[in-house]
From Swiss-Prot:
[4Fe-4S] cluster 2 binds at residues 45, 79, 82, 85. It comes from Methanothermobacter thermautotrophicus (strain ATCC 29096 / DSM 1053 / JCM 10044 / NBRC 100330 / Delta H). The gene is hdrC. This is H(2):CoB-CoM heterodisulfide,ferredoxin reductase subunit C. Belongs to the HdrC family. The keyword Transmembrane helix does not apply.
Length: 185
């Protein structure tokens, strides 16, 4: 069997989502069409060195409109949004904007990395993606700061406001947060 005979390498018209392609192109501007697949983005990606995340593949699939392939790929969530790819792109493609939009579409379709859901759960519970711990409180005291930063940790009423916003936007449902148990479903 040759490479051209492999079924998974064939792009079929039915796999192309033109609406998704247009959304992606709107997020990345006209620049997305200028990508000539040089690989600078993938070569500069710190996450791509240690994970299966390949920026160039995402951009190529986005250009074609392969929505299902992009949003169902767990590697989509391995981007740290450090902008290394975008800063080095010789064609000025808005790569990170494309990745963010693809993640939004993935989340709406029920594809979200468990680690990202866990961070969302921390935000719901504490108002922070990374809750403060004893070691951090001790370090804050050691450098002359109060144990708690002036955030939801100090102002519980602010956490109530954060939670109202979360409920109003449906973020809790998006990540599968159960208010009764305080856990993800």
């Amino acid at each position: 069997m040759t490479l051209l005979q492999r079924e998974e390498n064939i792009i079929r018209k039915g796999n192309i989502d033109k609406e998704f392609s247009e959304k992606i192109k709107a997020a990345g501007g006209d620049s997305l069409e200028y990508c000539f697949q040089c690989g600078t983005c993938t070569g500069s990606c710190p996450s791509g060195r240690r994970t299966p995340y390949r920026v160039r593949q995402i951009i190529r699939k986005a250009n074609v409109g392969l929505k299902d392939e992009i949003i169902s790929d767990p590697a989509l969530w391995m981007c740290t949004t450090c902008y290394s790819c975008q800063e080095r792109c010789p064609r000025k493609v808005k790569i990170v904007d494309v990745v963010k939009l693809a993640r939004n579409e993935a989340a709406k379709a029920g594809f979200m990395a468990p680690a990202h859901k866990a961070v969302g759960s921390f935000v719901i519970k504490t108002g922070h993606g990374v809750p403060i711990n004893d070691a951090t409180m001790e370090l804050r005291k050691a450098v002359g700061l109060g144990e708690l930063p002036p955030t939801t940790h100090q102002f519980p009423e602010a956490l109530e406001e954060v939670q109202k916003i979360i409920k109003a936007t449906g973020f809790d449902q998006l990540i599968g947060y159960n208010w009764e148990t305080g856990e993800l479903e």
